[in-house]
Amino acid sequence: METLRYRFDGQRGARAGLEHALVGVVASGNLEVLVERVPLEGAMEIEILTAARGFGAIWQAVLDDFAARHPLRDVRISINDVGATPAVVSLRLEQALEVLQGADA
C-alpha cells in the first residue's frame, strides 16, 4: 500500500450541506471517498491510501484538475483506492462533493 498526501489552497467554502459525505466502495477497480468539513486554515487536504504503487504523477494530475474546478477551503478528502482509473476517481470526487453539499448523487 502507498499513502499519498496533497494540500491545495482553498478559495471558497463548500456550499451548505452535510458535515461529511462517503461515496463508492473499496473493491477491485473502485475506490471510496470520504469528504469532511474541518478547519484547515483555508486549505483542502487530500490523503490517498492506494494498492497501486507508483502512480503519484497521475494522482497529482487528477487532483490538480479537481482542485482547479473546486478550490475548496477547510475540506479534508480521504481516498481508499483499489486500482480505480482516473475517470472513476474524478467521478467519485464529484459525487462526494455533491453529497456533501446536499445534492443527490
UniProtKB/Swiss-Prot annotation:
Pfam families found in the cross-reference section: ACP (PF06857)
InterPro entries: Mal_deCO2ase/Cit_lyase_ACP, Malonate_deCO2ase_dsu
Chain positions found as O-(phosphoribosyl dephospho-coenzyme A)serine: S28
UniProt PTM: Covalently binds the prosthetic group of malonate decarboxylase.
GO MF annotation: an example: acyl carrier activity
Alphabetical keyword list: Cytoplasm, Phosphoprotein
Subcellular location: Cytoplasm
GO cellular component entries: cytoplasm
Function: Subunit of malonate decarboxylase, it is an acyl carrier protein to which acetyl and malonyl thioester residues are bound via a 2'-(5''-phosphoribosyl)-3'-dephospho-CoA prosthetic group and turn over during the catalytic mechanism.
Family note: Belongs to the MdcC family.
Protein name: Malonate decarboxylase acyl carrier protein
Organism encoding this protein: Xanthomonas euvesicatoria pv. vesicatoria (strain 85-10) (Xanthomonas campestris pv. vesicatoria)
Gene, per the UniProt record: mdcC
